[in-house]
């Protein structure tokens, strides 16, 4: 039995989904092999995915990769943005009901790690701003999750984190925070921006999760909507930031990566994309300016939801994802186009 099969069994055994409309878990990976993940000169993006299906789109592991010559880098910021413009979308997985999600569901996940440095040690929290699609009904719902990556299991309590949502059990001793945001009926083109920003004091981190709809069909928008404002209570904070770090793994062996990736509808489910055409962009705020994340891979690795039949390439300096056989590789070392 291979590693991904073991992970899948663990995830399926943990599914206890309370009946709350649109309540969806977006699982982080877990190191279930018992192997020790040790840091070398830089992280290895291929610990969890070496072949399809994988979360597909664009992601930064904090690595420049020039034909195998790898150089790590670190980005710290208080705000990150994920841009998407979709002109075609249809996904289907006939096995989806086994995971508790609709067969036509899919997600586009904007995932980033919050690093909190305290006098007691370093804590890591996985922030997810997710577009959950019912692709046969042209329905989009925004959902967020927060997971604790500091220990081998994610543990959060209602006294440790508050917001518009709530803490729930994911089974297997894990707890996480989630909130269900607004829903939209869409037509194409559909373009919007995921937005995550944060600030901190000596005893708490404040996270705003939201989006900005740019266009649905022929209607243009432009208003930012923060649908969740989260407080993570943490004593003795020295510093905190949203982090991309190619030098180190999180305390539980995942990545300090930033992901804008397609996957299944939730609960660790994969899906296959029968139709897809979209433009993607990954950005952070530096000195008050929107700045492209420079190097991008074609897949993410922190999330367990994965995709078949998504091929990502560059077109005139811009990442494009459409139907095709996945290639898990470096996409560019020089993303510089500002689409926002």
Curated annotation (Swiss-Prot):
Optimum temperature is 90 degrees Celsius. Thermostable. InterPro entries: Peptidase_A5. Residues 29-41 form a propeptide. Its EC number is 3.4.23.42. Its main location: secreted. It comes from the Archaea. This is Thermopsin. The gene is thpS.
């Amino acid at each position: 039995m291979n590693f991904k099969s073991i992970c899948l069994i663990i995830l399926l055994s943990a599914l206890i989904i309370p009946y709350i409309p649109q309540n969806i878990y977006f699982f982080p990976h877990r190191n279930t092999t018992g192997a020790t993940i040790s840091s070398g000169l830089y992280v290895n993006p291929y610990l969890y995915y070496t072949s399809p299906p994988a979360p597909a789109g664009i992601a930064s592991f904090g690595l420049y990769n020039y034909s195998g010559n790898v150089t790590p880098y670190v980005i710290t910021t208080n705000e990150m943005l994920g841009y998407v413009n979709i002109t075609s979308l249809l996904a289907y997985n006939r096995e989806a009901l086994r995971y508790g999600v609709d067969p036509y569901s899919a997600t586009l996940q904007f995932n980033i790690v919050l690093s909190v440095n305290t006098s007691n040690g370093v804590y890591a929290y996985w922030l997810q701003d997710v577009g959950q699609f019912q692709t046969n009904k042209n329905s989009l719902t925004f959902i967020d999750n927060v997971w604790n990556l500091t220990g081998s299991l994610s543990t959060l309590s209602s006294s440790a984190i508050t917001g518009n949502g709530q803490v729930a059990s994911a089974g297997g001793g894990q707890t996480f925070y989630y909130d269900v945001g607004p829903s939209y009926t869409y037509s194409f083109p559909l373009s919007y921006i995921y937005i995550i920003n944060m600030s901190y004091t000596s005893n708490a981190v404040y996270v705003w999760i939201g989006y900005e709809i740019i266009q649905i069909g022929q209607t243009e928008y432009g208003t930012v909507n923060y649908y969740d404002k989260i407080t993570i209570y943490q004593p003795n904070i020295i510093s905190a930031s949203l982090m991309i770090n190619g030098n180190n793994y999180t305390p539980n062996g995942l990545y300090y990566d930033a992901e804008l990736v397609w996957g299944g509808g939730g609960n660790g489910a994969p899906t296959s994309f029968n139709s897809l055409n979209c433009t993607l962009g990954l950005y952070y705020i530096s000195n008050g300016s929107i700045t492209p994340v420079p190097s991008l891979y074609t897949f993410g690795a922190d999330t367990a939801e994965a995709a078949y039949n998504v091929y990502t390439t560059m077109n005139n300096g811009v990442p494009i994802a459409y139907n095709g056989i996945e290639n898990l590789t470096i996409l560019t070392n020089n993303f510089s186009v500002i689409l926002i």
